[in-house]
A protein has these predicted regions:
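Alpha/beta-hydrolase-fold catalytic nucleophile elbow
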Residues: 107, 153-154
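Solvent-exposed, acidic/flexible segments
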Residues: 40, 51-55, 127-134, 177-180, ...
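Conserved SGNH/GDSL esterase-like catalytic core that processes O-acyl groups on lipids
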Residues: 38-41, 47-132
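Generic structural signal for well-ordered alpha-helices
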Residues: 93, 134-138, 184
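Catalytic His-Asp segment of secreted/periplasmic serine-dependent ester chemistry enzymes
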Residues: 155-256
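A short helix->loop->beta-strand "cap" motif at the edges of active sites that frequently abuts
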Residues: 144-149
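Active-site phosphate/pyrophosphate- and oxyanion-stabilizing loops and adjacent acidic/basic residues
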Residues: 60, 139, 185-188
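N-terminal secretory targeting modules
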Residues: 1-43, 47-54, 64-65, 99, ...
Length: 256
């Protein structure tokens, strides 16, 4: 009788242990897949575009950790209002598919300043001012996919008084610190109108491109550019820990 009781207890213990191990294995499996069923859409300028400037960019680091799908619409020279050869963000929205996205980030852009564009206010709804174009961009995105979680990311600091084209062919006079400060304040104010979360890289990113040593180590530097605008792969690696929790929060909230 005691042997049978012991046998029953042993079997029960084995069943319990097997159940616990199964639960742990299932938990580890789903933890390993991360956000594999989620899609992160990226809009941005040359810091988001896949170019020679960084073999590994911020979104590569984030994707490796979170395992989400990434659709990258980053383009060189683009911004909320930047026009001419590049369409602005509010026009790009009309050309891309947002229906399958779970979250979207817009990163940038100081391409908008230094071109004599009027800054405007956070209440503008017009193509004539930068503030108006920010509003138009966000409104179009939210109308296209109301369930999409949208996050706004301010530009990282650029080299003070950076001028892309000294010959003036791009009509770019340079980025003063005052212009950059005002631009970021406006972008944050516009985002707050729609209760959108903001990742403020302008104030939180620790690298200072005005420092020559920092620029040499963490920014693109070759015969074509030494401008303190585009972080290299190491610069993106330092930026990545700020991006990861921001994107993870957006993905976690999506679909709710």
């Amino acid at each position: 009788m005691l042997k049978k009781l012991h046998l029953h207890k042993t079997r029960a213990l084995v069943i319990v242990v097997a159940f616990v191990l199964t639960v742990l294995l299932i938990s580890q499996f789903f933890a390993g897949t991360g956000y594999a069923s989620k899609t992160w859409i990226i809009m941005g300028d040359s810091l988001s575009a896949k170019t020679f400037r960084a073999d590994t960019a911020y979104y590569d680091y984030v994707q490796k950790d979170l395992r989400c799908k990434v659709i990258n619409y980053g383009k060189n020279g683009i911004g909320y209002k930047e026009s001419g050869q590049k369409e602005p963000f509010y026009e790009q929205v009309d050309e891309i598919d947002l229906s399958d996205g779970d979250c979207l980030t817009i990163f940038g852009s100081f391409n908008d300043i230094g071109k004599n564009f009027e800054l405007g206010s956070s209440d503008d709804i017009t193509e004539e001012t930068i503030g108006g174009c920010m509003n138009l961009t966000i409104r179009k995105i939210l109308a296209s996919n109301p369930s999409l979680r949208v996050g706004i990311v301010t530009p990282t600091p650029w080299l003070t008084n950076f001028a892309f084209d000294p010959n003036g062919e791009q009509n770019f006079s340079g980025t003063s610190r005052e212009e950059c400060d005002a631009y970021v304040s406006l972008l944050i104010a516009v985002a707050e109108k729609y209760n959108l979360p903001v990742l403020d890289l302008y104030h939180e990113f620790e690298l200072n491109p005005d420092d020559p040593d920092t620029r040499a180590k963490y920014y693109v530097e070759n015969e074509h550019e030494d401008v303190g605008v585009h972080p290299n792969s190491e610069g993106h690696r330092i930026m990545y820990p700020l991006w990861k929790p921001f994107v993870e929060d957006l993905l976690s909230d999506s679909g709710k």
